[in-house]
């Protein structure tokens, strides 16, 4: 599980009940270098350096095991890199509002829209918290705020600004992951938000064409934190993705391989 930039593993912890319900998956939630409790050394100066740190983590902690990877936003770009690096060892790829076009000026983005504003809620919050919440919230509500407070805000208050600044200054990967591999046959789930004004959804639809076994869902009333905006729909899609991978790895199934 790989989170996005400026947050930490807690952004994705709300998905854990869905993943745990099947009872067969060990979940590993990373804190990327410079975020959460992971320190970024001076060598972390680009997205490529972060990607290599994640590759090293997989090699050191998973050995030769097969694994699935789910990446959100910046973590989606890193998840794609893992597919390019490990190939058939990756059982499935989950992309949650992933970065597809690294250069912001080249992204196809919808206009910024707030579908439901709650000025009373914002006025009740700490001003800094209200600003961070309002930047991404598509539907402002008490429940939506509480999910943001518990999942996103801790990481936003903890990241190493110097380290993240170095990464952001060298943001694109040197080689697009899909240019490194000819094909990937595992189940791919791509979830985008219709109102995601950070990475958009149109570039994500174009990326889906690079994967032969890809399920795409553009969630309505969802922005860049689509899993916080639409937790029920996100959970159902993730459950289906897990089911697809479990079907493949059953004994006798075509392409079955060792369970994680």
Label the predicted regions.
Residues 49-66:
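Conserved acidic catalytic loop of the alpha/beta-hydrolase fold
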Residues 177, 186, 200-209:
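Short alpha-helix in the alpha/beta-hydrolase fold that links the catalytic acid
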Residues 1-40:
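Conserved HGGG/HGGXW glycine-rich cap/lid loop of the alpha/beta-hydrolase fold
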Residues 71, 75, 79:
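Gly/Ala-rich beta-loop-alpha elbow adjacent to hydrolase catalytic centers
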Residues 222-235:
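Catalytic histidine-centered segment of alpha/beta-hydrolase-like enzymes
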Residues 80, 84, 90-124:
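Flexible "cap/lid" loop of the alpha/beta hydrolase fold
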Residues 184, 190-192, 196:
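Short beta-strand/loop motif that positions the catalytic acidic residue
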Residues 104-106, 124-182:
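Conserved alpha/beta-hydrolase catalytic His-Asp/Glu region
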């Amino acid at each position: 599980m790989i989170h996005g930039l400026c947050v930490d593993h807690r952004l994705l912890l709300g998905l854990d009940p869905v993943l745990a319900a099947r009872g067969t998956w060990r979940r590993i939630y990373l804190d990327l270098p410079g975020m959460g409790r992971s320190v970024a050394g001076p060598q972390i100066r680009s997205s490529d350096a972060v990607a290599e740190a994640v590759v090293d983590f997989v090699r050191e902690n998973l050995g030769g095991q097969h694994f699935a990877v789910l990446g959100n936003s910046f973590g989606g770009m890193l998840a794609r890199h893992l597919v390019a690096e490990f190939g058939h060892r990756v059982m499935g790829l989950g992309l949650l509002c992933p970065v597809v076009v690294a250069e912001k000026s080249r992204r196809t983005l919808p206009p910024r829209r707030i579908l439901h504003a709650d000025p009373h809620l914002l006025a009740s919050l700490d001003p800094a918290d209200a600003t961070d919440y309002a930047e991404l919230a598509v539907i402002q509500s008490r429940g939506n705020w509480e999910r943001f407070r518990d999942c996103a805000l801790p990481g936003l208050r903890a990241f190493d600004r110097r380290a993240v600044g170095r990464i952001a200054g060298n943001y694109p990967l040197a080689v697009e992951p899909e240019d490194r591999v000819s094909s990937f046959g595992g189940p791919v789930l791509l979830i985008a938000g219709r109102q995601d004004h950070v990475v958009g959804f149109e570039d994500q639809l174009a990326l889906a064409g690079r994967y032969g076994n890809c399920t795409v869902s553009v969630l309505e009333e969802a922005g860049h934190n689509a899993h916080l905006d639409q937790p029920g729909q996100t959970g159902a899609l993730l459950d289906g993705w897990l089911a697809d991978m479990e079907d493949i790895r059953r004994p006798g199934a075509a392409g079955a391989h060792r369970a994680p």
